Amino acid sequence: MLMLWTFAVLLGAVAGREVCFDKLGCFSDDAPWSGTLDRPLKALPWSPAQINTRFLLYTNENPDNYQLITSDASNIRNSNFRTNRKTRIIIHGFIDKGEENWLSDMCKNMFRVESVNCICVDWKGGSRTTYTQATQNVRVVGAEVALLVNVLQSDLGYSLNNVHLIGHSLGSHIAGEAGKRTFGAIGRITGLDPAEPYFQGTPEEVRLDPTDAQFVDAIHTDAGPIIPNLGFGMSQTVGHLDFFPNGGIEMPGCQKNILSQIVDIDGIWEGTRNFAACNHLRSYKFYTDSIVNPTGFAGFSCSSYSLFTANKCFPCGSGGCPQMGHYADRYPGKTSRLYQTFYLNTGDKSNFARWRYQVTVTLSGQKVTGHILVSLFGNGGNSKQYEVFKGSLQPGTSHVNEFDSDVDVGDLQKVKFIWYNNVINPTLPKVGASRITVERNDGRVFNFCSQETVREDVLLTLSPC
């Protein structure tokens, strides 16, 4: 293997070739594009005719059937494209296609909350080949996206501030290439698990980086090393804000057995995709869910996921927490620094949104060994029961824990407490919570009190105090 790698690098030292295309410019296979340790195999991108990039326009007026548009201004004017709306351009990755359901599903969620031009980029002619070749085709597709955006600006007077590129996997780096060609003037780029092989550790001109747009955010869901984890996504931070949900490596719900993964509820094809790259695909599923859950993906500033799970990163800072996904651009400090890193937990099924709470329970009653659980009730809904502590329950002691609720309970109105130990005790001990304090991630604190104690498995309701 080492000899093969060395041979490939030496082969890359040969004088490079170049290919040029009308309106797009010239592309070389010299370093840093090829012939390096990170990109040992030399290749030139395919022609636009061979890749056959297509732009599929969905709008609020045509949410189910796309209009095919080109970088011709008259063609765009005759479509449902509206210059008084934001434009979000979704770009798929390796082996994928622009007509895959997830892209149009993302558009449809957008139509639920905004009026928008939603363009799905189909470059399957260049993505369904060897990975090495696809990474080179990225450059041409990025140039074509940039050409479309430049026509919007020059011929339709459209502001690049209103352009948002959303790329998955290799699509993230296509967005980066388009951003470079528009000199960072595009309003926003979102990288959905940017592809790692041939990009991690490469110079900024090769990959997505924070200078490619006015604001760049990224979601990392498959950031384990390619060997041995088969992690397809980058662990390297690439934006102003980088989110690592669930630690960024293993996503909840992706550890099913082979049969259950392939015989998926969405069908054999989707199930097979999930089995092969479940973690990698989670990034666009999280983003799609975030569109209709504007407060359900709060990211917490933290130096590591282990500290986050140890409850060392709550609550949000004075500027609040950024929301991973669609509403990340609402964060006041979004461009104050580069490579800001945030952690959060998500659900494991279709509803991925979670709301984090910190609960402090001060015990009363008798000393026993057991588990204490609480459930939250508010004007937005009710949570399940979550365990706060297990061990020796002593009156006067306080126990703190954080949990992620699948319901945003809103402003809290009451809390219910319960304890159990599953041990037969003829004395029938009673335990209570004299005070329960609940803090939301926005720093809002709610206090509840009770003077009562209850036996095992009996609910105790605490009222505001």
Curated annotation (Swiss-Prot):
GO terms for molecular function: all-trans-retinyl-palmitate hydrolase, all-trans-retinol forming activity; metal ion binding; retinyl-palmitate esterase activity; triacylglycerol lipase activity. The active site is at S169 (nucleophile), D193 (charge relay system), H280 (charge relay system). Residues 355-465 form the PLAT domain. One of its GO terms (cellular component) is extracellular space. Disulfide bonds join C20-C26, C107-C118, C254-C278, C302-C313, C316-C321, C449-C465. The keyword Metal-binding applies. Transmembrane segments: none annotated. It is found in: Secreted. Inhibited by bile salts, is reactivated by (pro)colipase/CLPS. InterPro entries: AB_hydrolase_fold (IPR029058), Lipase (IPR013818), Lipase_LIPH (IPR016272), Lipase_N (IPR033906), Lipase_panc (IPR002331), PLAT/LH2_dom (IPR001024), PLAT/LH2_dom_sf (IPR036392), TAG_lipase (IPR000734). It comes from the Eukaryota. It is an enzyme of class 3 (hydrolase). GO terms for biological process: intestinal cholesterol absorption; lipid catabolic process; retinoid metabolic process. Its EC number is 3.1.1.3. Residues 1-16 form the signal peptide. The keyword Protein biosynthesis does not apply. Keywords: Calcium, Disulfide bond, Hydrolase, Lipid degradation, Lipid metabolism, Metal-binding, Secreted, Signal. Pancreas. Ca(2+) binds at E204, R207, D209, D212. It holds the Pfam family PLAT. It catalyses: a triacylglycerol + H2O = a diacylglycerol + a fatty acid + H(+); 1,2,3-tri-(9Z-octadecenoyl)-glycerol + H2O = di-(9Z)-octadecenoylglycerol + (9Z)-octadecenoate + H(+); 1,2,3-tributanoylglycerol + H2O = dibutanoylglycerol + butanoate + H(+); all-trans-retinyl hexadecanoate + H2O = all-trans-retinol + hexadecanoate + H(+). Belongs to the AB hydrolase superfamily. Lipase family. Plays an important role in fat metabolism. It preferentially splits the esters of long-chain fatty acids at positions 1 and 3, producing mainly 2-monoacylglycerol and free fatty acids, and shows considerably higher activity against insoluble emulsified substrates than against soluble ones. This is Pancreatic triacylglycerol lipase. The lineage of its organism: Eukaryota, Metazoa, Chordata, Craniata, Vertebrata. The gene is Pnlip.
